[in-house]
Amino acid sequence: MNRNLTVAMTAALMMTGTVSQAQEVNIGRSNITLKSDLMTPEALWAMGRIGSAQASPDGKKIVYQVGYYSVKENRGHQVLRIMDADGKNDKLLTTSAKSESDVAWLDNQTLAFLTDGQLWTMSTDGSNRHQLTHSDIAIEGFRFSPDKKRVVLVKSIPYHGTIKENPDDLPKATGMLITDMNYRHWDHYVTSNAHPFVANVTANGVDVGKDILEGEPYESPMAPFGGIE
């Protein structure tokens, strides 16, 4: 692993100590008894939904993301799990009520992931958690360079090229002034664009980074199907 990344992880542990967790219900795997062979809404919501999965560099482990949902709480919870490549020794890594996602291998012993809009790392047993970023804008995706000296961070920045901002004297107005096409993506209006930021990995963590599409009206990755790839 890159030396700066190792130093940053150690420094983060010394500075943060124990991270306080929000007092929220920790939604996990549901135990449901099927009384018939009918597929019911309750049965569907009780099922975990597997997201991304990645094999370790040596091919011995697989880490993957699972989404669990609670009808009572009216929300979901994304968790990370790890298992041997043969499917044995499956283990839950996420212990917080906050979601953890977008997991990736840094080496055979270290994982990087997102939680609460920030980039973190941890060991493959779930210990040694370190926060690498302190971004004012939530991080939505990331990809480390092969030498681990730089990382691409995906952040959404405000964009009003097609939907104009509300006038200062009408800040709570719900009407919209649309002046161009591409003002909506499927289920949401385009008031922000995803931009890739190239950041350096230093001994103090990961810096803010440089927006390589600064001032441009484009988005990368592109909604709704674009990803960090």
Q: What kind of region is each of these model predictions?
A:
Residues 1-8:
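Bacterial N-terminal signal peptides that target proteins for export
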Residues 8-17:
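Bacterial N-terminal signal peptides
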Residues 20-22:
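Boundary at the C-terminal end of the N-terminal hydrophobic targeting segment
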Residues 24-26, 78, 156-202, 214:
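Predominantly five- to eight-bladed beta-propeller fold
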Residues 26-49, 73-75, 81-99, 122-138, ...:
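Multi-bladed beta-propeller domains
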Residues 47-62, 95-112, 129, 136-154, ...:
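Conserved beta-propeller blade repeats
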Residues 68-72, 158-161:
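Short glycine/acidic-enriched loop and turn motifs that connect beta-strands
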